[in-house]
C-alpha cells in the first residue's frame, strides 16, 4: 500500500513539474517573438506603474496618451544615438593615436616613450572592447611594446 502511495505521489509531482516546464517554455518563446518596441515598453512598465500609483488617475491618463508614447520613443532613440556616438568617439581616439604614431615615426617629432607605449596599449585593447576585428584577424594573446615588456 505504501509503494502505491509513493508511486502516486511521484506521478503527481512529475505531472506538476511537466506542466510548470511547459508554461516556462511558452513564456520563453513568447519573449523571443516580441518586438523590440514592446520589450522597451515592458522595461519601462514598472516605472509607469510607480507613477500611476503615486499620482493617481491624472498620471495614468498621461502615461497612456499618444504624446507620452511618442516622447518615450524619442528618448529611447536618443539614448541609442548617445551609445553610437560614444563608440565613434573611441574609434576617433584610436585614429588620432595612429596618426600621432605615424608622425612620430616619419615626422621626426619627439614623443615621450612611456606615453607612446600607453597609447599603443590603449589602441591595441580598443578593438576587443567593441569587437571590431576584421574577419581574417584574431586578437593576439599579448603585445610587445617598445620597451620589450609583454602585456
Swiss-Prot record:
One of its GO terms (molecular function) is nutrient reservoir activity. Residues 1-19 form the signal peptide. Its main location: other. The modification Pyrrolidone carboxylic acid is found at residue 20. One of its GO terms (cellular component) is aleurone grain. The keyword Signal applies. It comes from the Eukaryota. Pfam families: Gliadin. Coiled coil: none annotated. Keywords: Pyrrolidone carboxylic acid, Seed storage protein, Signal, Storage protein, Vacuole. It is found in: Vacuole, Aleurone grain. Belongs to the prolamin family. Seed storage protein; serves as a source of nitrogen, carbon and sulfur for the young developing seedling. This is Prolamin PPROL 14P. It comes from Oryza sativa subsp. japonica (Rice). The gene is PROLM20.
Amino acid at each position: 500500500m505504501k509503494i502505491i502511495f509513493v508511486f502516486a505521489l511521484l506521478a503527481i509531482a512529475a505531472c506538476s513539474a511537466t506542466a510548470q516546464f511547459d508554461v516556462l517554455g511558452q513564456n520563453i518563446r513568447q519573449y523571443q517573438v516580441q518586438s523590440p518596441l514592446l520589450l522597451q515598453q515592458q522595461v519601462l512598465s514598472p516605472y509607469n506603474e510607480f507613477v500611476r500609483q503615486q499620482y493617481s488617475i491624472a498620471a495614468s491618463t498621461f502615461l497612456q496618451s499618444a504624446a507620452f508614447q511618442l516622447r518615450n520613443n524619442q528618448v529611447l532613440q536618443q539614448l541609442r544615438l548617445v551609445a553610437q556616438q560614444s563608440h565613434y568617439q573611441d574609434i576617433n581616439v584610436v585614429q588620432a593615436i595612429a596618426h600621432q604614431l605615424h608622425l612620430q615615426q616619419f615626422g621626426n617629432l619627439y614623443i615621450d616613450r612611456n606615453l607612446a607605449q600607453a597609447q599603443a596599449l590603449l589602441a591595441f585593447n580598443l578593438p576587443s572592447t567593441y569587437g571590431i576585428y576584421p574577419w581574417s584577424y584574431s586578437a593576439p594573446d599579448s603585445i610587445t611594446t617598445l620597451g620589450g615588456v609583454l602585456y
